[in-house]
């Protein structure tokens, strides 16, 4: 089930995360947050990135990950099933699947949204595609277009 509405969204996030076959799948987007499922191949990573305007919460549902944080990747955190990491806006970070054989299954919550609603990346993007680089126009465009339409739909019709 995918939701791109400003409505209450109920899902068994563990079940959906474990069965997600895609590198990245956006399943819920609201004006203030976004729920994204991810599946990383053995030794695959989420690129070293920074979200200037987004807080990010990452929870590991299956597997073991290494989280590197800081401009110089100077802090290392080992994350196992059931653990989470909360990354404040403006913090450099990278998530790495530490397994040689098993997929890493995780979900992440961005606040505010960081990817176009409903986006699915079957494989890890090779260049850009993270939505986190300041020059990434496409993702910023969709992010603010979505916010604009949500705001516009909340204004009484007689004022439109």
From Swiss-Prot:
What main location does UniProt list? virion
Q: Name one GO cellular component term.
A: virion component
Please name the Gene3D superfamilies in this protein's record: Jelly Rolls
Keywords of the record, alphabetical order, are: Virion
What compartments host this protein? Virion
| One Pfam family hit | Cupin_2
The Cupin type-2 domain sits at 37-110
Q: What is this protein called?
A: Uncharacterized protein L612
List the source organism: Acanthamoeba polyphaga mimivirus (APMV)
Kindly list the organism's lineage: Viruses, Varidnaviria, Bamfordvirae, Nucleocytoviricota, Megaviricetes
């Amino acid at each position: 089930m995918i939701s791109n509405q400003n409505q209450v969204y109920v899902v068994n996030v563990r079940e959906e995360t474990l069965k997600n076959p895609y590198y990245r799948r956006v399943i819920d987007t609201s004006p203030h947050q976004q729920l994204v499922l991810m599946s990383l191949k053995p030794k695959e990573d989420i690129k070293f990135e920074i979200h200037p305007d987004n807080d990010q919460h990452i929870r590991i549902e299956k597997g073991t990950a290494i989280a590197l944080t800081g401009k110089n990747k100077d802090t290392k955190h080992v994350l196992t099933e059931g653990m989470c990491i909360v990354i404040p806006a403006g913090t450099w970070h990278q998530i790495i699947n530490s397994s040689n054989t098993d997929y890493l299954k995780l979900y992440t919550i961005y606040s505010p949204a960081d990817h176009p609603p409903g986006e699915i990346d079957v494989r890890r993007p090779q260049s850009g595609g993270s939505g986190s680089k300041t020059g990434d126009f496409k993702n910023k465009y969709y992010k603010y277009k979505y916010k604009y339409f949500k705001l516009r739909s909340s204004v009484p019709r007689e004022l439109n």
